[in-house]
Amino acid sequence: MSANEIVTSEIQDKVCTISFFNPKGNSLSTLHLLRLTKEFNDVSYNDGINVVVLKSSGDGAFCGGASIDELVKFDRFEKAKEFFFAFGKLLLTMIRCQKPIVARVHGKIVGGGIGLVSACDYAIAKKEASLRLSELTIGIGPFVISPFVIRKSGISAFSHLSLDTQWRDAEWGKNFGLYSKVVDTNEELDQEIKKLADDLSKFNLNSLMKLKEIFWEKTENWEQLIDERAEISARLILSEIASGRLQKIIGNQ
């Protein structure tokens, strides 16, 4: 599967729709991370765009987080850190993108998928969009995404999600600010996304850009923070515990 197939973008009437796909639960590989980062960088400096809609393909999960297929292959610290930093770099690029990002969350979000939604400025979810931070179950932790999740939903929600690794329903996500709205059907989801995107496409771009700055002010030191968190994740993913649990997951697929 080529880079052009896993991430696509389309611009229409000042709305840029970025879509990603992975047949394995819309999980994110290095290729996904790099391509998505490039797309958000390009969008940021395009004056013909007012708003970005982020979506994924298929009827299953919205995002399964980091690709297990990649995590299980790491045997060197440098490569592992490079992957986790790339994940954090994508989220940093999203919050520094000058245009508001609206997430269309049609299904479950797991692990890094929660970080992805947290880095968006508005999220509309379908009732099936349950959520779970599963990192502890594989011997690591949600270190790289933690600043974004805490900023979006608060330390209380983050501690609940990270320590109790059970599923939460979409209403839980809404109550803690991760989702802005929860709807019942795909039709309602598309209608709500279209209405909001259409409205934002007509607003003053300079006003939208200033609002985006305010949403994510005081995050200037996050690149260093992400680098430190990526190092923690890289060391843990190479541990015997993590390796054994990842191998077990792969074996059950």
Where do the protein language model's features map onto the residues?
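C-terminal alpha-helix plus adjacent terminal tail
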Residues: M1-D13, N22, Y45-D47, D59, ...
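Conserved CoA-thioester-binding segment of acyl-CoA-metabolizing enzymes
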Residues: M1-K55, L92
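Terminal peptide-recognition signature
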Residues: I18, L36, L54, S67, ...
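Phosphate-coordinating loops and pocket residues in cytosolic domains that bind phosphorylated ligands
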Residues: T30, G64, K73, L163, ...
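A general structural signal for well-ordered alpha-helical segments in protein cores
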Residues: L33, I68, F87, S146, ...
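Glycine- (often His-adjacent) and acidic-residue-rich active-site loop
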Residues: R35, S56-L90, I109
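Catalytic-core regions built around general acid/base machinery
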Residues: E39, A86-Q98
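Crotonase-fold acyl-CoA enzyme core
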Residues: T93-L205
